[in-house]
Amino acid sequence: MFAVFSKVWSLFAAPITLLLIAQFLAPEVQGFYYTFLSLIALQSFVGLGFSIVITQFASHEWANLSLDDAGFISGDERARLRLISLGRLVFKWYAWASAVFVLLVGAGGYLFLSQSPEPGISWKVPWFSLVVVAGLQFWVLPFLSLLEGCNQVHTIYRFRFIQGIVGSLAIWLTLFLDFGLWMAVAGLGMGLFCSLYLLLVFYKNFFQPFFTIKPKEGIQWREEIWPMQWRLALGGSLSYFVVSIYTPILFHYHGPVVAGQMGMTWQLVSALGSLAMAWVATKVPRFGILIAQKNYAELDRFFFRNSGISMGVISLGAVLLWLLVYGLNYFEHPLAQRMLSPLPFGLFIAGTVLGQITQCQAAYLRAHKKEPFLVYGLVHGFSNGIVVWFLGSRYGAIGASAGYLLVKSLVAVPLCSYIWIKCRKKWHADEVY
């Protein structure tokens, strides 16, 4: 329930944030803000798919574990030690990855943003501050992913709901106080504070053995995790070219104003997709439990019911959002100039609806602790990056949006559906009736 509340809040807060950005930020500063966010998304290149691996592997171990009244992990000792081994491995990995992210993205982003023809905008200190906060938030990610895999979804999403509210309020206050680009630092910083409070207060006893026990035997990274992770690493890295490439391309070739329009549009579209995906993402631990029990019939019923709701939500939301953008342009509202026009907006949101199909299918298959999307990720990422770059650099937002929809229609949905049908048939041959 709180997962849905959280996504509803995001959908509710997004228009308010957009209005305040339009009111308090110049169009050029808006472009810098959304380009900041797109560059921060380069985290996917250092995360190497570990967050998905953590959730999937933890859910399989949690099938034999539970929390006692004091919040400690109890149950099968072998499963407990394997879970602790997994946690210790990923906590160390993310500590190093966070440091690499801060150094490389901080410096690389500085060089990229320095090419802007808007020298009067004060962006350097906010940028480096944002990178540091994002690096800390990135280090916290495996702790949250582990909790999700251990079926603590209700508590996590309750805190994410609170986190979303607090983060939005911080952004709004920063805008009201005319701190400009510091809004990005304020929003992410409050999110980091909420995450740390959850881990250090609510789950202190849960995480205690991860720092006091060193299992002699446990998860074998090379034999168990790496066969799945290296595929996720490639696919996750290339996902940047599917999710976050649009604003930087338009920033580089067409300037910060067009990039700002693209960023605001993508924020609305992403909020809708995130809301719709809540009906599937929160069920992933349950998928893992049913798969471990080989109860595939119940798995399919559970999946189709929730993915159907997800597709219904995103389809209805897409129509409503497009009508909103059309109305703003029809009545010549000033906010219309801060977003893409109805044609490219419609192309982007149509592609997002199609992309929801692949998101649901991917969640289903990855719950099997396998990663069959290597070829898909390579083809989808490269084709989208090349097509969007080629069309976007030449024809602006219309070219980028047309390329996005074209790749979703002709590459992503057909290829992902083929993989889903093939793997589902192969992996469920040993169903327990």
Predicted regions and their residues:
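Interfacial segments at transmembrane-helix termini and the short loops linking adjacent helices
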Residues: 109-130, 256-257, 297, 323-353
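Interfacial transmembrane-helix starts/ends
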Residues: 34, 70-96, 225-229, 295-312, ...
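Membrane-interface junctions at transmembrane-helix termini in multi-pass inner-membrane proteins
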Residues: 135-160, 346, 350-377
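Helix-loop junctions and terminal segments of transmembrane helices
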Residues: 48-77, 269, 273-294, 367
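Hydrophobic alpha-helical transmembrane segments
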Residues: 128, 157-207, 383, 397-421
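Signature of the first transmembrane helix
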Residues: 1-60, 64, 230-257
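Transmembrane helix-bundle signature of multi-pass secondary active exporters and lipid flippases
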Residues: 36-48, 235, 239, 243-245, ...
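Interhelical loop/hinge segments that connect adjacent transmembrane helices in multipass membrane
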Residues: 181-187, 199-243, 294-297, 423-433
